[in-house]
Amino acid sequence: MSTDKITFLLNWQPTPYHIPIFLAQTKGYFKEQGLDIAILEPTNPSDVTELIGSGKVDMGLKAMIHTLAAKARGFPVTSVASLLDEPFTGVLYLKGSGITEDFQSLKGKKIGYVGEFGKIQIDELTKHYGMKPEDYTAVRCGMNVAKYIIEDKIDAGIGIECMQQVELEEYLAKQGRPASDAKMLRIDKLACLGCCCFCTVLYICNDEFLKKNPEKVRKFLKAIKKATDYVLADPVKAWKEYIDFKPQLNNDLSYKQYQRCYAYFSSSLYNVHRDWKKVTGYGKRLAILPPDYVSNYTNEYLSWPEPEEVSDPLEAQRLMAIHQEKCRQEGTFKRLALPA
């Protein structure tokens, strides 16, 4: 880029889980590191990796599966840190829609997806469960999966527990229906992945920018770590500061989404090696990565100790599901303490 300003592209319009990035800006943490950051919003979320990979933008956010696929398609990007770790992701639907926990109940239904790789996931899952392409209708929804379910444009769609599922729960509450009528068929279980890490939201860099500016990236991540620590230490105070800067998020839905995102925030920012191995394997299974593909992530720009990975990731997922259900019922800010 021809400017000293670092450009950073969000993966979507500002959401509750973008709070560390904006607070690093408003609280002066970037400035403390001698950085000038321009935070940008995409018109189309599908453009993010292409814009960063082509060098039009320096850094940004994207899910793990998209980060892997971007480099495989000739857009050189690398993950340097994690923002949101393993949010539960799956096929969302409403009770009474004719869909059940039996995946084959999706036969004859309209299934929504965000972008290209969501369609690939649906096709692979339906094939795995003995369905043909003509047995369902795939509908590209962008980030409007919950909206399309509510408007009956689709019967089900791929979404995240702490975002689109909360949106469905809020809709149900206004209809006088229990929030538990919002259901999810988790993709990690359907696809036998053992983790929801393919939708881990990452801080990514253009490779050339990373090569030329290693110290700037280190300083950027120091500022992000300080902001993340601030959010985790006092989430209510942090939220008040965030909505003062982003008043469009000052509503019940956004606050509840923030509560549900809280347990997923990566406190260390470290890329989890085991998750990358699993998702790289999943990408090869989906045929979006070549057989010899090498994962494009690094932790070398994080200047604090790396935590130990959990010894039993399946048990961690089970406990997180219980934790998130309790959060839904009680509306509290709590982190899940997992054994190493």
Curated annotation (Swiss-Prot):
It catalyses: N(6)-(pyridoxal phosphate)-L-lysyl-[4-amino-5-hydroxymethyl-2-methylpyrimidine phosphate synthase] + L-histidyl-[4-amino-5-hydroxymethyl-2-methylpyrimidine phosphate synthase] + 2 Fe(3+) + 4 H2O = L-lysyl-[4-amino-5-hydroxymethyl-2-methylpyrimidine phosphate synthase] + (2S)-2-amino-5-hydroxy-4-oxopentanoyl-[4-amino-5-hydroxymethyl-2-methylpyrimidine phosphate synthase] + 4-amino-2-methyl-5-(phosphooxymethyl)pyrimidine + 3-oxopropanoate + 2 Fe(2+) + 2 H(+). Disulfide bonds: none annotated. CDD domains: PBP2_THI5 (cd13650). Its cofactor is Fe cation. Pyridoxal 5'-phosphate binds at residues 115-118. Transmembrane segments: none annotated. GO terms for molecular function: 4-amino-5-hydroxymethyl-2-methylpyrimidine phosphate synthase activity from histidine and PLP; metal ion binding. Its EC number is 2.-.-.-. Homodimer. Responsible for the formation of the pyrimidine heterocycle in the thiamine biosynthesis pathway. Catalyzes the formation of hydroxymethylpyrimidine phosphate (HMP-P) from histidine and pyridoxal phosphate (PLP). The protein uses PLP and the active site histidine to form HMP-P, generating an inactive enzyme. The enzyme can only undergo a single turnover, which suggests it is a suicide enzyme. This is 4-amino-5-hydroxymethyl-2-methylpyrimidine phosphate synthase THI11. It comes from Saccharomyces cerevisiae (strain ATCC 204508 / S288c).
